[in-house]
């Protein structure tokens, strides 16, 4: 996770607020073939897909390097603080900061 966070910091700079591991790897109940779920918390952005694609090649490289699928989502800082969507609640409950 340290390598992943450092790479994302190079891509997003000051926009990157945090990186969280969640899902089966965070809970410790992953199995062979489980993906690694990651939430990338960004200060702000206008276009989700533009920001997503900024890091997609890097995430793919990490997936290939470690032979594991990294599934990631981006969340705005304001969403993290104010929204009550199931995915946000789940990450708050079980997420591990990188």
Predicted ranges, named:
Residues 1-17, 27-32, 43-98:
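Catalytic core of pol beta-like nucleotidyltransferases
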Residues 37-41:
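Short beta-strand->loop micro-motif that forms the acidic, two-metal-ion catalytic signature
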